[in-house]
Amino acid sequence: MADVLPLVEARLRTALGEPDARAAVTFLGTDRIEVLRFTDGDVVRYATLGMSAQPMADPTAVLADPVKGPRAELVLSVRRGVADTDKVLRPLAVLAASPQVEGLIVAPGASLDVGDPLWPEAPFTSVLVAESGGLVEDLELDAPADPVRFLPLLPMTPNEAAWKRVHGAQALQERWLTQGTDLRDPARTSVPLD
C-alpha cells in the first residue's frame, strides 16, 4: 500500500487549515511521529501525524497484518492564551506511539494516561478518546485497508479518569454535558462527580 501520511496531512489541512508549527519525535523502535499545531481564533488544535502509517494490531496476534486493521490520528483542541499548552507535543507523540510500543489499539471510549501533566501545571494527566467524524472526517483508503479515523482527545483530571473507570466513558461525557463543562479550557477543574 502507498504511504498514507501525505493523504492524512492533506485531510488535516483541508479540515483545519495550514499548520503554524510542527514538531517531530522519534522513539527507539518506532516510526517518526509529528505533531502539527493549527490555530483558529482562540482555539489551538494539535494533531498527530504518523500514528496511521501502520494499522494498529492486536497484541495477541502472531503476525501483524500490514494493511488491515484500524488506523488513527489524535486531535486535541484547547483554548489559546490560558496555559502553555505547546508543551503537550511530547505527551501527544507518546500517546500516538503507544500502538507501536505497547500494542495498544486506540479506540473511542478508551483512556490514555501519560502519568504526568499534559503540559506544565495542567490539571490533566490523561485523555478520553472520543468518536471520530466531527472536526476531521475519516479518510477512506483503498480496500482492504481500514479508514484513518481522526480521534478527538478530551483531557481528564485524575478524579475524572478514576470515575470513568467505574462508570464508563458515556457516563463521564454525559456528566460533562449536564454540567456545561468547557472541555477546551486548559485550566478547568474536575467536574463534580458526586
Predicted segments with their positions:
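Acidic, proline/glycine-rich low-complexity IDRs
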Residues: 1-71, 75-194
